[in-house]
C-alpha cells in the first residue's frame, strides 16, 4: 500500500463527489520473465474476483472495462474494475516499452513488446470504504465529521438527508465514473442522470440545487 497524490484530478475535487487530491493505493505486483512466469492475466482477475466476493459484493454488479494503460515509457492492456458504476481498482498488464517507430500504437505513442511483463494493480482504499458505506459522495464516507463541520460553519443544511437530493447526487457519482468528460458535456451528463432516475433535465439545474443548500 502507498499514498498517492493526484494532481490531474485537482479541477474535479469537490465537483464530482468522487475525486480526491490524495488517496491510499493498495496493490499487488508480479515481475514475470519469458523464462519464468509467476502469474499473469487469469490469476490476477481471479484474485480480484475473490477479494470482491469475499467482501460481500454482488458478482452481478461487477464490471471489467478494458482500457489500455500508458505512462512513464511503458504501456499495456488494463482492466478498470467497476462495482455498481464505481471504479474500485485497475489491473494493468504492463508488457510494452516506448520505442520510436514501434509497431504497436497506444494513445498516440509507439511501443514494442518487452522481455519481461509485469502485473501492476491498484486498489483505491477510500473507494472501498465509500462502496461499503453507500454514501452519496466519497467525502461523506471518509470525512463525515469534516463535512458536517464545514456545512455548519458555512451555515448551510446538509441536504444529503433529503432522499431526492441524495439519490440525484448518488446517480451523478456513479455515472461520472463511467462517462468520459472529454467526450461528453456537462449538459449531456445531466441528461443521462435525469433519464436514469426518471426526471427532467431541468430539475437538475445548478441554480435549483444552490437554493436547496441555502440556509
Question: Which role does the model predict for each range below?
Answer:
Residues 1-215:
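Structured aminoacyl-transfer and RNA-binding surfaces used for tRNA recognition/handling
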Amino acid at each position: 500500500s502507498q499514498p498517492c497524490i493526484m494532481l490531474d484530478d485537482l479541477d474535479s475535487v469537490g465537483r464530482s463527489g468522487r475525486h480526491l487530491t490524495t488517496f491510499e493505493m493498495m496493490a499487488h505486483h508480479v515481475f514475470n520473465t519469458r523464462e519464468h512466469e509467476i502469474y499473469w492475466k487469469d490469476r490476477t482477475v481471479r484474485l480480484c474476483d475473490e477479494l470482491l466476493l469475499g467482501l460481500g459484493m454482488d458478482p452481478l454488479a461487477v464490471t471489467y472495462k478494458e482500457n489500455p494503460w500508458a505512462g512513464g515509457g511503458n504501456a499495456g492492456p488494463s482492466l478498470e474494475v467497476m462495482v455498481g458504476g464505481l471504479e474500485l481498482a485497475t489491473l494493468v498488464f504492463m508488457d510494452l516499452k516506448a520505442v520510436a517507430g514501434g509497431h504497436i500504437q497506444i494513445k498516440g505513442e509507439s511501443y514494442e513488446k518487452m522481455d519481461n511483463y509485469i502485473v501492476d494493480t491498484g486498489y483505491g482504499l477510500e473507494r472501498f470504504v465509500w462502496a461499503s458505506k453507500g454514501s452519496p459522495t466519497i467525502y461523506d464516507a471518509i470525512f463525515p465529521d469534516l463535512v458536517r463541520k464545514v456545512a455548519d460553519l458555512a451555515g448551510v443544511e446538509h441536504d444529503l438527508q433529503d432522499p431526492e437530493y441524495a439519490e440525484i447526487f448518488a446517480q451523478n457519482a456513479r455515472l461520472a465514473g463511467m462517462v468520459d468528460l472529454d467526450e461528453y458535456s456537462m449538459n449531456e451528463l445531466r441528461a443521462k442522470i435525469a433519464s436514469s432516475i426518471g426526471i427532467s433535465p431541468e430539475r437538475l439545474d445548478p441554480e435549483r440545487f444552490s437554493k436547496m443548500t441555502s440556509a
